[in-house]
Amino acid sequence: MAVTKEDVIDFIAGMSVLELSELIGEFEEKFGVSAAAPVAVAAAGVAAEAVEEKTEFDVILASAGSEKIKVIKEVRAITGLGLKEAKSLVESAPAALKEGVSKDEAAELKAKLEAVGATAEVK
């Protein structure tokens, strides 16, 4: 009667940890292999990071343009700041309005600012 794979698996399942360790050592010697996990090349990790897409963006008010009052109103709506704080923010341009927002939200905020005459950037 031939030994099946299931017989081998059942036999191995009944072994202690010490016996399994010795068995693995014997396999490594007999077949010239190693049971260690393969190590990834460091350069491959660098390439993977370069492909990773940015997920958080900052909306920067570059300048208020000629319609400063409209821009202040829009900045208040976007940030929830009071009138005085929004005015100071607009006058101190370039300044960050929102940080760590999604790509879609950043594009939407930029479009709103440009619609009232401001110059905005997404970084």
Curated annotation (Swiss-Prot):
The keyword Cell membrane does not apply. Keywords: Ribonucleoprotein, Ribosomal protein. One of its GO terms (molecular function) is structural constituent of ribosome. InterPro entries: Ribosomal_bL12 (IPR000206), Ribosomal_bL12_C (IPR013823), Ribosomal_bL12_C/ClpS-like (IPR014719), Ribosomal_bL12_oligo (IPR008932), Ribosomal_bL12_oligo_N_sf (IPR036235). GO terms for cellular component: cytosolic large ribosomal subunit. It comes from the Bacteria. CDD domains: Ribosomal_L7_L12. Pfam families: Ribosomal_L12, Ribosomal_L12_N. GO terms for biological process: translation. Belongs to the bacterial ribosomal protein bL12 family. Forms part of the ribosomal stalk which helps the ribosome interact with GTP-bound translation factors. Is thus essential for accurate translation. Homodimer. Part of the ribosomal stalk of the 50S ribosomal subunit. Forms a multimeric L10(L12)X complex, where L10 forms an elongated spine to which 2 to 4 L12 dimers bind in a sequential fashion. Binds GTP-bound translation factors. This is Large ribosomal subunit protein bL12.
